[in-house]
């Protein structure tokens, strides 16, 4: 309801449904509420592939994207079995662009919020959605390349000023 009251507003949603240690952080009721009330009012959704599968189980990636009823969806991937990873930007159910990066080894905490924050900042500065996703991914990649491990925990992105 709050988002409806302050429209127009560009809402970017990072649906944190799974922790970096693969712990489920969601419930069916919460997912349904996000799908019904939040996603249709959002400009961009940034799920990783595992979260997309939780949001729309049993569907292909393109079917899942279409079912979420959000204008733009940036699906991020981190398949550990591959050398290269590919993120995909959709407008409705149409694949608009693929972004390819070399896989960075390790487990990370904070990559999704780094990405969504970077995209938000770029949109505020006037970038269009495709440019904001491109530069936001590049910034996040640099932060992950410089990530530090705290003890035996996951790596944490080092968020420093970065100019693409």
Give the residues covered by each predicted segment.
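Glycine-rich beta-alpha junction loops
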Residues: 17-19, 51, 77-80, 102-105, ...
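Charged C-terminal helix
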Residues: 130-164
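Glycine/small-residue-rich loop that forms an oxyanion/phosphate-binding "nest" at active or ligand-binding sites
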Residues: 1-37
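Short, small-residue alpha-helix embedded
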Residues: 105-129
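Conserved phosphate/ATP/ADP-binding segment of small-molecule kinases
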Residues: 24-96, 130
């Amino acid at each position: 309801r709050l988002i409806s009251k302050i429209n127009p507003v560009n809402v970017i949603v990072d649906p944190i449904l799974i922790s970096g240690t693969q712990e489920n952080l969601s419930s069916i009721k919460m997912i349904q509420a996000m799908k019904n009330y939040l996603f249709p009012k959002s400009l961009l959704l940034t799920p990783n592939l595992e979260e997309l599968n939780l949001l729309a189980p049993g569907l292909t990636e393109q079917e899942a994207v279409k079912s979420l009823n959000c204008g733009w969806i940036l699906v991020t991937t981190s398949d550990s079995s591959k050398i290269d990873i590919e993120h995909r930007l959709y407008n409705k159910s149409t694949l608009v662009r693929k972004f390819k990066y070399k896989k960075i080894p390790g487990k990370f905490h904070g990559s999704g919020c780094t990405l969504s924050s970077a995209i938000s900042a770029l949109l505020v500065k006037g970038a269009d959605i495709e440019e904001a996703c491109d530069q936001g991914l590049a910034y996040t990649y640099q932060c992950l390349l410089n990530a530090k491990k705290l003890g035996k925990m996951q790596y944490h992105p080092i968020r420093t000023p970065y100019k693409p």
